[in-house]
């Protein structure tokens, strides 16, 4: 049973889109779901981590890099998808600073089967620590659909603090699409929590430049 009131969510979305229309920016603002938790001890309780694919892509401009074998690198080139081959990864020489920089540069990584197995050896634990270990892409799958699936996936990961934020939409989307994404994100998040809604202290929606709107 979701405790999220549809009305409250719709109202918040309308307020956010209204405020942004009044003050046009020269970029498309992202809408973030901000989460505050309670009755949760990150030291003792299990730190959860989970991903859910949303019905609509929240960040179309999300930066993805393909760590590919020759075939995937060629496909990525044709699509205009940024990519690196094994030789380029070897050049990073497991240098922590360089791996960290790479992890920061992209929102997510995809990797061919032959490459993913070598990642720990080539790069060390850096991508994993950043919560950006690559998603496997086989040659049987379409690279383009895998990219879109990755763009539509959001990840909830509890670290040491009891608050987090995930992108659930952007201001070029229709209100109903934002609503569907918010609903799915919240319900998925609650399913990860030990005591479900009893662990939720507050939920806010916020556009990049706008004030937060409370929805729970």
From Swiss-Prot:
The record's Gene Ontology biological-process terms are:
translation
Would the keyword Ribosomal protein be found if you checked this record's keyword annotation? Answer: yes
Lineage, uppermost ranks? Eukaryota, Viridiplantae, Streptophyta, Embryophyta, Tracheophyta
- Its name, as the record gives it, is Large ribosomal subunit protein uL1z
- Entry's family note: Belongs to the universal ribosomal protein uL1 family.
Task: Print the keywords alphabetically.
Answer: Ribonucleoprotein, Ribosomal protein
Subunit info?
Interacts with the GTPase NUG2.
The cysteines joined by S-S bonds are none
Record keyword Ribosomal protein present: yes
GO cellular component terms? cytosolic large ribosomal subunit; cytosolic ribosome; extracellular region; plasmodesma
- Read off the Pfam families from this record: Ribosomal_L1 (PF00687)
Q: Which GO molecular function annotations are given, in alphabetical order?
A: RNA binding; structural constituent of ribosome
């Amino acid at each position: 049973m979701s405790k999220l009131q549809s009305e409250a969510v719709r109202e918040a979305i309308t307020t956010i889109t209204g405020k942004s229309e009044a003050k046009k920016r020269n970029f498309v603002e992202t809408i973030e779901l901000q989460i505050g938790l309670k009755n949760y001890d990150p030291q003792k309780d299990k730190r959860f981590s989970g991903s859910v694919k949303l019905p609509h892509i929240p960040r179309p401009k999300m930066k993805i890099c393909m760590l590919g074998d020759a075939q995937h690198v060629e496909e990525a080139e044709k699509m205009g998808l940024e990519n690196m081959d094994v030789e380029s990864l070897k050049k990073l020489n497991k240098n922590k600073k360089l791996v960290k920089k790479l992890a920061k540069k992209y929102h997510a990584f995809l990797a061919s089967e032959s490459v993913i197995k070598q990642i720990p050896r080539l790069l060390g634990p850096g991508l994993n620590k950043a919560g950006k270990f690559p998603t496997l892409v086989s040659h049987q799958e379409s690279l383009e659909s895998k990219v879109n699936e990755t763009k539509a996936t959001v990840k909830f990961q509890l670290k040491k603090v009891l608050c987090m934020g995930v992108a659930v939409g952007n201001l070029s989307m229709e209100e109903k699409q934002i609503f569907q994404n918010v609903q799915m994100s919240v319900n998925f998040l609650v399913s990860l929590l030990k005591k479900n809604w009893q662990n939720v202290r507050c939920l806010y929606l916020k556009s990049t430049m706008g004030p937060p709107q409370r929805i729970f």
